[in-house]
């Protein structure tokens, strides 16, 4: 008896015809089916140190291609493919290990760069040596090496600073100014300029040491300091000016004075100075000369206190009061000392073109006022005496005298 079945024998290829005979002599004919759907290679193969880039694909028809990327810590070996292809027989193309351990891209240095032969390299297995060269603006120190090696722990050996900055030419002196050099004159340094008082900076305030061709130099021309002048000082009416010249430099002085019969108002001396915008200007406006007769004179001010304690004694005033109705009899006169009114010192300032002239009007006013005050004080004293010697006091005084006479 002969029977036929469809099945799969892992020892045979897909589509092979397999004939088997049982112990009873039956013959079985089997046509093996494909392990996968015809034209589908199935999942991509595993490759050491790499992983396939599948995206959303799950089926791979004939001639499909799958690329791989290296795992962390591994780099693709140059000249080795990272792609497999689905063949007509449903198998993936042969492949080899193309990811190996490698150092990362060599360190970028501020003073040096990799030589051109290393620009396109991305695979640096252990033991790889790379070499640097100085960047523009730097010069190599012969005693130091510019090489670095990929070590066993996949790090690069340190590189000595074998390049030093080039120096720009020494700056020339700045006439009537100052050059500030904060960090030297090496490549990348900046210097600043300023002028002395009375001078203006013409040009830029700072320049930079930079690359010019194959060397380094200052990136601009040096400035200059030019002297600042003031305009001619203004003339004044009824006066003269001393210190005139053809030009007026910083801090130069002119002096004004008035003609006879005129008084100067303002600053008699002005000097040439500089504004914030470096423009010459005079320190103040010129003075004015005004005719003496037109100058207003301030009246003197006298400070008279309302009350005060007399301090300067005057000649005593003597007064005898007679007894009414009786013959006058000799009596011992009563003497009352009347102090003079306090006189404040005259503090009024008097100004005159003639030093010998005095303010007679003001003095007469003061003396008259003092006399009035003295007269008022005298009247008060008389009133006081009259009160003391009233009729009652006089009666007592007369009775006492009669008693003395009878004795």
From Swiss-Prot:
Compositional bias (Basic and acidic residues): 343-357
One GO CC annotation: membrane
Residue numbers on the Extracellular membrane side: 40-368
Domain Sushi residues, every copy: 40-101, 102-165, 166-227, 228-291
Record keywords, A-Z: Complement pathway, Disulfide bond, Glycoprotein, Immunity, Innate immunity, Membrane, Repeat, Signal, Sushi, Transmembrane, Transmembrane helix
UniProt subcellular location: Membrane
Tissues/organs with expression: Testis, spleen and lymph node.
Family statement drawn from the similarity comment of this UniProt entry: Belongs to the receptors of complement activation (RCA) family.
Protein name: Complement decay-accelerating factor transmembrane isoform
Native source species: Mus musculus
